[in-house]
From Swiss-Prot:
HAMAP family, alphabetized: ThiG
Compartments, as annotated in UniProt: Cytoplasm
Protein name per its UniProtKB record: Thiazole synthase
Entry's Gene Ontology molecular function annotations: thiazole synthase activity
Family as reported in the entry's similarity comment: Belongs to the ThiG family.
Protein origin, superkingdom: Bacteria
Top enzyme category: transferase
Its biological purpose: Catalyzes the rearrangement of 1-deoxy-D-xylulose 5-phosphate (DXP) to produce the thiazole phosphate moiety of thiamine. Sulfur is provided by the thiocarboxylate moiety of the carrier protein ThiS. In vitro, sulfur can be provided by H(2)S.
Encoding gene (name): thiG
Active site: 111
Catalysed reaction equations from the record: [ThiS sulfur-carrier protein]-C-terminal-Gly-aminoethanethioate + 2-iminoacetate + 1-deoxy-D-xylulose 5-phosphate = [ThiS sulfur-carrier protein]-C-terminal Gly-Gly + 2-[(2R,5Z)-2-carboxy-4-methylthiazol-5(2H)-ylidene]ethyl phosphate + 2 H2O + H(+)
Length: 274
């Protein structure tokens, strides 16, 4: 449920707080029924929706806006399909209107994606910067999807983006955290939440990203395309929680040599003269 007061260890983005640190998508599910159940099982409170696909009635997206309970979920419209900054800005406005129609009149959020080609689906840094600057001036809360590039991330948070969302590996690839070192650098320096987006395949990878200090994750394909999406949704939700708790708990340092877990003094046979 969308929070009006911050719960302990809430995910805080702009002026909103959430209990769950797992964001989910709505694409690639075999049915709306499975999607609803998987989102519920995950515990996710932020759900991203591809504005262009809903608007154009792409199979699996037509009527999507009415399939989820937006009184309990926060919509994150995304600009998937935008090949330029100009298209992204246009889709962002469509998304804001869609959120208003569905009852979220104060929702000015947008997951910004500018992807000019369809083979590799890698975000365009220049187009992203240009669109982000425009959208921030127009009053949007911008969550940009980017390559794991520290300098780009810094430009975006200095510009006023509410988060940065570096990719773990290409969208839908299931390659996991190929950019872990670069993401760790962004996490170490970012004053805004870092949301790892794209490429995560398994709950163990989700847990690892959270252990690194990510503020949240966005996972779609790994849940939607799993053999059992509902079970995978729950698994990803639990992994996100476990990774967050492990990060807060503080793992022991790696050591070169063994260190006994029980004291070696006072053992039988250790007395003088033995």
């Amino acid at each position: 449920m969308i929070q009006t007061q911050s719960p302990p260890d809430a995910l805080q983005i702009a002026n909103r707080s959430f209990r769950s640190r797992l964001m989910t998508g709505t694409g690639k599910y075999r049915s709306f029924e499975v999607m609803r159940a998987a989102v519920a099982a995950s515990g996710s409170e932020i759900v991203t929706v591809a504005v262009r696909r809903v608007q154009e009635g792409v199979p699996g997206h037509g009527g999507l806006g009415q399939e989820l309970n937006w009184q309990k979920l926060w919509m994150l419209p995304n600009t998937a399909g935008a090949k330029s900054a100009e298209e992204a800005v246009r889709y962002a406005h469509f998304g804001r209107e869609m959120a208003k129609i569905l009852g979220q009149e104060d929702n000015h959020w947008v997951k910004l994606e500018v992807i000019p080609e369809t083979k590799y689906l890698l975000p365009d840094p220049l187009g992203t910067l240009q669109a982000a600057e425009t959208l921030i001036k127009q009053g949007f809360t911008v969550l940009p999807y980017i390559n794991a590039d520290f300098h780009l991330a810094r430009r975006l948070w200095e510009m006023g983006c509410a988060t940065v969302m570096p990719l773990g590996s290409p969208i839908g690839s299931g390659q996991g955290l190929q950019n872990a070192a670069a993401i760790a650098l962004i996490i170490a320096e970012s004053p805004v939440p870092v949301v790892v987006d794209a490429g995560i395949r398994t709950p163990s990878e989700a847990c690892r990203a959270m252990e690194m200090g990510a503020a949240a994750l966005l996972i779609n394909t790994a849940i939607a395309q799993a053999e059992e999406p509902i079970a995978m949704g729950r698994a990803m939700g639990l992994a996100t929680e476990a990774g967050r708790l492990a990060h807060q708990a503080g793992a022991i340092p790696v050591k070169t040599y063994a260190s006994a877990s029980s004291p070696l003094t006072g053992l039988v046979g250790s007395a003088v003269g033995s």
